[in-house]
Every structure is written in structure tokens, then in C-alpha cells.
Design a protein with these regions (language model features):
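Bacterial Sec-dependent N-terminal signal peptides
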Residues: 3, 9, 13-36
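N-terminal low-complexity, Ser/Thr- and acidic-residue-enriched intrinsically disordered segments
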Residues: 23-104, 114
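Short, solvent-exposed loop/turn elements at domain surfaces
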Residues: 55-57, 119-122, 258-259
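Surface-exposed intrinsically disordered loops and tails
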Residues: 58-87, 133-175, 271-285, 289-290, ...
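A conserved cap/lid and substrate-binding interface adjacent to the catalytic center
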Residues: 82-190, 210-216, 244
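Serine-dependent carboxylesterase/thioesterase catalytic core
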Residues: 173-260, 264
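Lipolytic serine-hydrolase domain surface
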Residues: 233-359
Length: 359
């Protein structure tokens, strides 16, 4: 099993870590997008995008995040203020923060989890941890999530605000005590890419430990790979239904990442997002066969919301080449593309490559 993880590493390092939409492809679509009818999704995607603020400069992260949240030209309209965090894992690979909207009564809250940062090898472990299942510790027998998802969840729960030292649990308990028992505040949990996958398991934890008694939860994930098996997803669905909570999985149909890890065959059948190079085709076939052989059957959680597709205008490499494929993958997965497809204003920050990734 460990040997096969190197195939994952090869695929992700060859394709994902070198995928940089440095050409700044404009989004070409005739559809106004989900965001025109769902401002919640636009706000959550904006918060997810801002989780990448100064990801390689943690000393400036908090101040930069406050500046970005204050901007009135974003979908967040300057209404959301930093209330907890940013919190970082020891190696800096994971980041999470919480905000509140004081323009409504009771206040609304949101937790945003950062996606994959290829500058931090620990993120590779969380992405590549899909090669084995671990029991989901807050569910029942048979509820399993990827090893990477469990590692990531444990990190999120252990992380503390870089200024106050408060954990997420301490923060949630604090704001819970500020409201009467009869009043529930809205809580949003969101993330993009790996952040979306971690937002899924964090949302399950949130309900499983009883926070639905204080908050009305709505989860929005964007471009998220799947987190667990069918039993976990059934548990996820049950606890959301019991809590009268909502979970939306927002995807660009031409984004490669949401097909991981349960719909890999569809990547080949649909040539997602464009003509697959032979090496990518071969590795995905091998990965799919491996998951089937070892009964690692992944299922996506949440209500599917499919965005309109978009076409990059500056990916002009030969069809079937690795360069062309990387260009399409980067464009379709980027936070700026998701914001555009939602009809939301662009942010100044989003998922960006490390210096060593730039070509």
C-alpha cells in the first residue's frame, strides 16, 4: 500500500504542483453563474480564497487578512471581520480562520479552511493519504475517512489562534455562551480544494459534538476531493438532516480535483479537463484499479451544485501534451475561476504556486 502512494506522489507532483495559471486566463462563459442567485456561495468562496492570504509569509498573514476582509468590493462587502485566527499547524501547512458578520442580529459566523499549499510537504500527506482508510472517530462502525482527512482534522482541532492561543473548541464555546439558548446563530464552514475536503470532515465533527444546539450550520465546499466511504457519507447525511443543516458541494465540471477519489474513471471517459496525456491516462487507470482492488470506494458528501463550464483562452500548447493538460488543470481548479463562475468579484489572493513551482 505504501509503495502505491509513490504513484500518487508522482501524479500530483508532475501535474498539480507544476500547475500554475500564470497566463491569468480570463473566464469565457455565457452563463452568469450560481452566484447571481446564491450570494451565500459567493461569500463563502471569497472567504475560502482569502485563506490563501500571505500563505508563505505567516508574520503578515493576520494583518493582510484583516485588510482583505475590509474591502467593500468583494462579495463579503467588508461586513465580515476576523474573529479568531489565523491558526496554523506547526509546519504552517494548514491554516484556518473564523469571521463574524455583525451587520445581522444575531451575528453570523464562518470558518474557512485553506486548501493545498504545495510549499508545505505536509499537505502532500493529507492529499495523498487517500491510499488508506481510517475509522472516523465520531461516527459509527464502518464510517471511514481517508488517513489524510483524519490527520488534517486532528491538526485543525489542535491548532490555536496565533495571537490568543485559543483553540477552535475554546472559540466556539466562547461565542456559544454569548447567545441565549433560544437563539441560534448562522455558522458557515467553507474551503477550497483540500480545504473543502477538510471542511467536510470538520462539519461532521461540528455536528457530532453537539454544536447544532447553538448554531444553524451551512457548509459550502468548492473543488473538494472526497473525504470518505459510503458509510461516512450516510452518517454525514443523517446528522445534517437531524440538525436541519445544509451542505453544498460546488464544482466546476471541468475541474480534475473533485473527481478524486471516487470518480477517477470519469476523468478518462470524459477526458477531464481536456485530452489526457498518455502518462496521466496510465496513472489514473492504475489508481482506479488500486482503489477497487483494496475496496477503497470513495463517495462525495453534500448536495451537488454544478457550475457552468469555462474555457481558458491562453492554453495554446499541443493537444495531448502535458503542458496543455497542466494549463487546463490549473485554470479550472483556480480560486479565480470559481469566483468568476459564481459571478463573484475577484480577490487579490488565491491559490498560488511556490517560488520553486514557477516556470
Amino acid at each position: 500500500m505504501k509503495a502505491f502512494s509513490y504513484i500518487f506522489l508522482l501524479l500530483f507532483l508532475v501535474i498539480m504542483s507544476s500547475c500554475d495559471d500564470s497566463l491569468k486566463n480570463p473566464v469565457t462563459t455565457n452563463n452568469n453563474g450560481l452566484g447571481t442567485s446564491n450570494p451565500e456561495a459567493s461569500v463563502c468562496m471569497t472567504l475560502a480564497s482569502l485563506s490563501y492570504v500571505n500563505e508563505n509569509n505567516p508574520a503578515y498573514m493576520k494583518d493582510s487578512l484583516k485588510i482583505q476582509l475590509a474591502k467593500t468590493n468583494y462579495a463579503t462587502q467588508g461586513k465580515w471581520i476576523l474573529d479568531w485566527g489565523p491558526a496554523l499547524s506547526p509546519d504552517g501547512g494548514n491554516m484556518m480562520y473564523a469571521v463574524k458578520d455583525t451587520s445581522v442580529n444575531p451575528y453570523s459566523y464562518a470558518i474557512a479552511v485553506r486548501g493545498t499549499d504545495w510549499c508545505f510537504p505536509f499537505n502532500w500527506k493529507e492529499d495523498l493519504g487517500a491510499v488508506e482508510f481510517d475509522p472516523y472517530p465520531y461516527g459509527g462502525t464502518g464510517d471511514s475517512i481517508s488517513h489524510g482527512a483524519l490527520v488534517g482534522l486532528n491538526y485543525l482541532l489542535a491548532m490555536t489562534d496565533t495571537s490568543t492561543g485559543k483553540s477552535l473548541v475554546t472559540y466556539l464555546n466562547s461565542i456559544s455562551s454569548q447567545h441565549p439558548d433560544s437563539t441560534k446563530s448562522s455558522m458557515f464552514i467553507t474551503g477550497h480544494s483540500l480545504g473543502g475536503m477538510l471542511a467536510t470532515v470538520l462539519s461532521a465533527w461540528f455536528l457530532d459534538v453537539g454544536y447544532s444546539s447553538k448554531f444553524e450550520l451551512t457548509t459550502y465546499t468548492f473543488a473538494a476531493p472526497s473525504a470518505g466511504n459510503q458509510q461516512f457519507v450516510q452518517h454525514y447525511t443523517n446528522i445534517f438532516n437531524s440538525a436541519d443543516a445544509l451542505s453544498y458541494r460546488v464544482v466546476n465540471p471541468n475541474d480534475l480535483v473533485p473527481y478524486f477519489y471516487g470518480d477517477l474513471a470519469d476523468v478518462i471517459v470524459g477526458q477531464i479537463p481536456t485530452t489526457l496525456p498518455y502518462v496521466v491516462d496510465a496513472v489514473i487507470l492504475a489508481m482506479d484499479a488500486y482503489f477497487i482492488k483494496y475496496d477503497l470506494i470513495y463517495v462525495q458528501a453534500g448536495i451537488l451544485n454544478t457550475l457552468p463550464s469555462a474555457t481558458p483562452t491562453d492554453c495554446t500548447y499541443p493537444s495531448g501534451s502535458l503542458d496543455q493538460y497542466e494549463c487546463y488543470v490549473a485554470f479550472n481548479h483556480h480560486t479565480s475561476t470559481y469566483l468568476s463562475l459564481l459571478g463573484a468579484p475577484q480577490t487579490e489572493y488565491g491559490d498560488t504556486p511556490c517560488k520553486w513551482e514557477q516556470r
